[in-house]
Amino acid sequence: MEQPIQPSQHNTKQKRHKSRQRQAAPNVISQIIFASRWLQLPIYLGLIVVQGLYAYKFMKSLWELMTNLQSMDANMIMLAVLNLIDVVMIANLLVMVIVGGYEIFVSKLRTKDHPDEPEWLSHVNASVLKVKLSMSIISISSIHLLQTFVNAANMDEKTMMWQLFLHLGFLVSAVAMAYTDKILYSTSHKGH
């Protein structure tokens, strides 16, 4: 014979059911938010396409340098080489953004014990990536500045001045970011 449910038992079951419903809603929202990181995947795949375009640009510029070498003076050769270096540095920047960004924001890369794994990938985090990116941007800016000064006779003075200011802005920003990271790191590790 089945015993009737006491009012106190019924209230307890209702409370547990309502509690589970309240917990389920934030859990679903959390899962949706967490899964939204995969929306970045097409962006990183697009950057891989851009990297392919830079590889094409590099090969085209290299071919032009080789086929026109006889008609080029030393300055023209230097500008062509600096252009090739610029393309390489931008491609390196793309690799850092693609690999580091995917690793930090989307999903872990499963490259453990891979012989070609970059050294920095084992300890990549937002701070390391930020420093590497700022150093790459400064390096690319340096190459552009060097190209400008090698070609100074054909450049407007105002353009050269603005490129120099922009480069100095990159330098100041990098120093400020490094200082901020240092302060944040020392503050977060004080009690340890």
From Swiss-Prot:
Residues 12-21 have a biased composition (Basic residues). InterPro entries: UPF0114 (IPR005134), UPF0114_bac (IPR020761). It is found in: Cell membrane. One of its GO terms (cellular component) is plasma membrane. Keywords: Cell membrane, Membrane, Transmembrane, Transmembrane helix. The chain crosses the membrane at residues 38-58, 79-99, 160-180. Its main location: membrane. It comes from the Bacteria. It is a multi-pass membrane protein. Coiled coil: none annotated. Residues 1-11 have a biased composition (Polar residues). Residues 1-23 are annotated as: Disordered. NCBIfam families: HI0507. Belongs to the UPF0114 family. HAMAP family: UPF0114 (MF_00143). This is UPF0114 protein PM1258. The lineage of its organism: Bacteria, Pseudomonadati, Pseudomonadota, Gammaproteobacteria, Pasteurellales.
